[in-house]
Each structure stands twice: as C-alpha cells, then as structure tokens.
Amino acid sequence: FCGWLSDRIGRRPVLLAGLISGALTVLPVFHGLSYYGSLPEPNTTMIVVLLLVLVVPLACITGPQTATLPELFPARTRYTAVALPHNLAAGWIGGMSPFMVTWLGVRFGDPLAGLWYPTGLLILASVVGLLFLPEVRNRPLED
C-alpha cells in the first residue's frame, strides 16, 4: 500500500510519515508490549495490535525506498550511490543495534532504555529527510 501511495502523492511525504511515526511509536508500543505481555493472562489481541502498529512506519519507509533510491541518482553512478550507503547503514546501524540496545538497557537499568537508540536514529533520519530529501516521484531514470 505505501509503495502505491508514494506513486500517488510522492515519495517524500510517505517516507517522512514513516520516519516520524516510527520515532513517535517505538517507545509507547514497547511499553505496551511489556505491560500486556507481563499480565498474569497476557492480552494476545493487544500484543498483536501493538505489533501491527509498528508495521505501518516500516511499510511507509520500505515501500517507497526501493523506488526512491534509484530515482535519486543518475544511471552511471546509481549502483554505487545506492549500494554503498545502504550496506554501510545496514552494517553499522543494523549491526550495532543489538549492542547499543543492550548497553543502554544495562547502563540505565531499564531494558526499554535501549529503545532510545532506534528512536534517536529515526529522529535523525526525519530531520535529514526534512532538510535534504527531494521529491523524486516521476523523475526519469535515464541520464
């Protein structure tokens, strides 16, 4: 749905909606998961609903991402321009996430404190997107 939506209204608004809604929902959703999962009779329905809340920002980011990245760069540099930052981010951000989440949880004595790491990254990405991400919908892919 989000890829289709980005074809209709633009890549930038859908991506920014995903980043901002992700930053706003990560902490409350995990607090809810902690609460509903620790009840004597865990509320499975609420747990599923809360997990689905996180799917919306993810879909808003990944849906248009595959169209946005190629549209940002000319054909002669596209492969390197897309692959290099994508894989560096996957390695550095994705690779460091378990360590950072665990370290923050231990450092502050709260297992949910580690969620400030992905929340902070989403806030940073939102600011960068607001300042620098152009609208690329309908941009020709030829040089």
For every predicted segment, state its role.
Residues 41-61:
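Hydrophobic core of transmembrane alpha-helices in multi-pass small-molecule transporters
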Residues 76-108:
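A late C-terminal transmembrane helix in Major Facilitator Superfamily
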Residues 20-40:
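C-terminal ends and interior cores of transmembrane alpha-helices
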Residues 2-6, 97, 101, 133:
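Hydrophobic/aromatic and small-residue hotspots that mark the transmembrane alpha-helices
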Residues 8-19:
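Cytoplasmic membrane-interface "Motif A"-like loop-to-helix N-cap segments
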Residues 7-8, 71, 106-108:
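Membrane-helix boundary and inter-helical linker elements of multi-pass secondary transporters
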Residues 29-32, 68, 120-143:
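Multi-pass alpha-helical transporter architecture, strongest
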Residues 60-73:
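Intracellular juxtamembrane helix-capping segments at the cytosolic ends
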